[in-house]
Amino acid sequence: HSCEICHNVGKSCEGSVEPCTSPEDQCGTVVLEFSPAPVSFRSIHKNCFSSSLCKLGSFDVNVGQNTYVRGRIQCCDEERCEEPQFSGHCASHPNGYYCPGIFGLFSLDSSANEAVCKGTETKCINIAGYRKEMYPGDIAYNIKGCISSCPELSLSNRTHEVDRNELIKVECTDAVKIPPSECQSSGI
């Protein structure tokens, strides 16, 4: 099985078609959006994916300070897949739950802020991994925040290859009802 492989900031990319290795048996396109404006940007990644990642479909992680990391995944059996579309993001109100929240690069365990969960977000997610690049090498990343339901993601056991994304941690826990800062004793 072969798929088009490319990565780009923006809404489109074109790359060469390369063979996939098991268990990554489907072609896919992932569009990531980091919002809100004025710093919102999108990136697109076309690659070989495992069917477990394809089932994820979409995710919206509230990383705090009214910022979201959103992803849309479209998989197909052809070498080149359609690009997934974003629907508008529904603004919702705080629901009383809290999670650690951060979008961190160059670290697998970034120190977190407090993310105020909204709407149906009652779970906390903690994802860490490496993005493989020719230059400057592996880039570590860590995303923590509120999410509506826990994704079924399996960890990668792949060897290090160029242009690959390697997940090394996916933790999903129940959000807490009170903000952690209120639990600390006032220094008397």
Swiss-Prot record:
<feature type="disulfide bond">
    <location>
        <begin position="6"/>
        <end position="13"/>
    </location>
</feature>
<dbReference type="GO" id="GO:0019834">
    <property type="term" value="F:phospholipase A2 inhibitor activity"/>
</dbReference>
<dbReference type="InterPro" id="IPR016054">
    <property type="entry name" value="LY6_UPA_recep-like"/>
</dbReference>
<feature type="disulfide bond">
    <location>
        <begin position="117"/>
        <end position="146"/>
    </location>
</feature>
<dbReference type="InterPro" id="IPR004126">
    <property type="entry name" value="PLipase_A2_inh_N"/>
</dbReference>
<comment type="function">
    <text>Inhibits the enzymatic activity of phospholipase A2.</text>
</comment>
<feature type="disulfide bond">
    <location>
        <begin position="76"/>
        <end position="81"/>
    </location>
</feature>
<feature type="glycosylation site" description="N-linked (GlcNAc...) asparagine">
    <location>
        <position position="157"/>
    </location>
</feature>
<dbReference type="InterPro" id="IPR016338">
    <property type="entry name" value="PLipase_A2-inh_b-type"/>
</dbReference>
<feature type="disulfide bond">
    <location>
        <begin position="54"/>
        <end position="75"/>
    </location>
</feature>
<feature type="disulfide bond">
    <location>
        <begin position="3"/>
        <end position="27"/>
    </location>
</feature>
<dbReference type="Pfam" id="PF00021">
    <property type="entry name" value="UPAR_LY6"/>
</dbReference>
<feature type="disulfide bond">
    <location>
        <begin position="150"/>
        <end position="172"/>
    </location>
</feature>
<keyword id="KW-0325">Glycoprotein</keyword>
<dbReference type="GO" id="GO:0005576">
    <property type="term" value="C:extracellular region"/>
</dbReference>
<feature type="disulfide bond">
    <location>
        <begin position="20"/>
        <end position="48"/>
    </location>
</feature>
<keyword id="KW-0964">Secreted</keyword>
<dbReference type="InterPro" id="IPR050918">
    <property type="entry name" value="CNF-like_PLA2_Inhibitor"/>
</dbReference>
<dbReference type="InterPro" id="IPR045860">
    <property type="entry name" value="Snake_toxin-like_sf"/>
</dbReference>
<keyword id="KW-0593">Phospholipase A2 inhibitor</keyword>
<comment type="similarity">
    <text>Belongs to the CNF-like-inhibitor family.</text>
</comment>
<protein>
    <recommendedName>
        <fullName>Phospholipase A2 inhibitor 31 kDa subunit</fullName>
    </recommendedName>
</protein>
<keyword id="KW-1015">Disulfide bond</keyword>
<feature type="disulfide bond">
    <location>
        <begin position="99"/>
        <end position="124"/>
    </location>
</feature>
<dbReference type="Pfam" id="PF02988">
    <property type="entry name" value="PLA2_inh"/>
</dbReference>
<comment type="subunit">
    <text>Heterodimer with phospholipase A2 inhibitor 25 kDa.</text>
</comment>
